[in-house]
C-alpha cells in the first residue's frame, strides 16, 4: 500500500535491466486494518485476499508469494497447470499428520486433518476463489470474536478452515520453509535441496539482515540482490529489541564477539527504556 520515489527508481531500473515490464498495483488497506494483527504480522497479510479478487476475469490463475520467498528454479509447471473445476488453490502442507490433526481439532474443521497448509505460497484459481466468495467469508470470520479466539495465524488459519477439501497439494519444493535462526542450533536438518524452487525464509531473521546474509542458505537471496539494481543497497541493521537480540546471538555464534556483546548491550538498554 506504499510505493515511493526510490521504489519507482529501482523497479524502473530492474525492468530496463531485464527488458521486461513490471506492473505495480497499489492497495488501499484501510478496511483491512481492523482485522487481527500481531507484532510480526500487519494488515498486509490480508492483501492476498484483494489480489485474488482483483484478478477475477483478468487472469485464470494467480501465483501469490510472501515477500520472504526467493525463487531458485523454474516455475513453468505452475504456469502450465490447469485447475479442475472445483479446486480453489494449489498449496503446500506444513508439518506432519499429527500436527494436521491438532489443527483440525483446534479450528473445528475435520478436513484440515488431510493437510494443513502454509499460506505463503498460493496458486489461486481466481474463478473458483470468487465463486466460493473466499475473501468475503474470510473477512467475516476474522471479524467474529469467537473465531478469532481459536486462531493463531490469522489469514492462514481462516484459509485452512475455508478451503479444506477444495485444494490440490504441491510438492514441498514449491514452499520449502527454513528459519535462519536454525543456524543458532548445534545441528539441524537443512530441507533446501537443488530441487527446491521456492525457499521460504520464515521467522524473524531474514537474509537481508546484516547478521544473516553470509550463511550458505542465504546465498540464493544474495545472488538475486547482486543481479539487481539493489546490489549496492546496504543490508538492514537491527533496529528493535528483538532484532538486536537475534543479531547478538548470530554474531556470537560466528565468533564476532565485539559486535555480539555490543548488540546485547544495546538490546538491554532498549528493554530498560520500554
Predicted feature descriptions by range:
Residues 1-2:
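Short beta-strand/loop segment that forms part of the nucleotide-sugar
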Residues 6-54:
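Active-site-proximal specificity loops/subdomain of glycosyltransferases
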Residues 29-35, 96-97, 175-179:
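A short acidic, often aromatic-flanked loop/helix-cap motif at beta-alpha or helix-coil junctions
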Residues 97-112:
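Surface-exposed acidic, glycine/proline-enriched linker/cap segments
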Residues 35-44, 103-106, 184-189:
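Short, surface-exposed amphipathic charged segments that create phosphate/polyanion-binding patches used
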Residues 24-30, 44-99, 116-117, 123-124:
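GT-A fold catalytic core of metal-dependent nucleotide-sugar glycosyltransferases
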Residues 126-274:
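A glycosyltransferase accessory/donor-loop signature
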Residues 86, 118-120, 156, 195-196:
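Short, surface-exposed beta-edge/turn micro-motifs
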Amino acid at each position: 500500500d506504499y510505493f515511493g520515489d526510490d521504489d519507482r527508481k529501482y523497479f524502473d531500473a530492474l525492468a530496463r535491466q531485464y527488458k521486461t515490464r513490471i506492473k505495480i498495483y497499489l492497495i488501499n488497506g484501510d478496511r483491512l486494518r481492523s482485522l487481527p494483527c500481531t507484532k510480526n504480522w500487519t494488515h498486509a497479510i490480508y492483501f492476498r485476499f484483494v489480489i485474488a479478487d482483483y484478478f477475477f476475469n483478468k487472469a485464470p490463475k494467480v501465483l501469490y508469494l510472501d515477500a520472504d520467498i526467493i525463487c531458485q528454479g523454474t516455475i513453468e509447471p505452475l504456469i502450465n497447470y490447469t485447475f479442475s473445476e472445483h479446486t480453489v488453490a494449489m498449496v503446500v502442507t506444513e508439518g506432519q499428520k499429527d500436527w494436521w490433526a491438532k489443527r483440525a481439532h483446534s479450528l473445528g474443521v475435520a478436513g484440515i486433518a488431510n493437510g494443513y497448509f502454509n499460506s505463503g505460497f498460493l496458486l489461486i484459481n481466481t474463478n473458483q476463489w470468487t465463486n466460493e466468495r473466499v475473501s468475503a467469508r474470510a473477512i467475516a470470520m476474522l471479524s467474529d470474536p469467537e473465531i478469532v479466539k481459536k486462531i493463531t495465524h490469522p489469514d492462514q488459519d481462516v484459509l485452512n478452515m475455508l478451503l479444506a477439501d477444495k485444494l490440490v497439494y504441491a510438492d514441498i519444493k514449491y514452499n520449502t520453509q527454513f528459519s535462519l535462526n536454525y543456524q543458532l542450533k548445534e545441528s539441524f536438518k537443512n530441507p533446501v535441496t537443488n530441487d527446491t524452487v521456492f525457499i521460504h525464509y520464515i521467522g524473524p531473521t531474514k537474509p537481508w539482515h546484516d547478521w544473516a546474509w553470509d550463511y550458505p542458505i542465504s546465498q540464493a537471496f544474495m545472488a538475486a540482490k547482486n543481479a539487481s539494481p539493489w546490489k549496492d543497497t546496504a543490508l538492514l541493521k537491527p533496529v528493535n529489541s528483538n532484532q538486536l537480540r537475534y543479531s547478538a546471538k548470530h554474531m556470537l555464534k560466528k565468533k564476532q564477539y565485539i559486535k555480539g556483546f555490543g548488540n546485547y548491550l544495546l538490546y538491554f538498554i532498549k528493554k530498560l527504556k520500554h
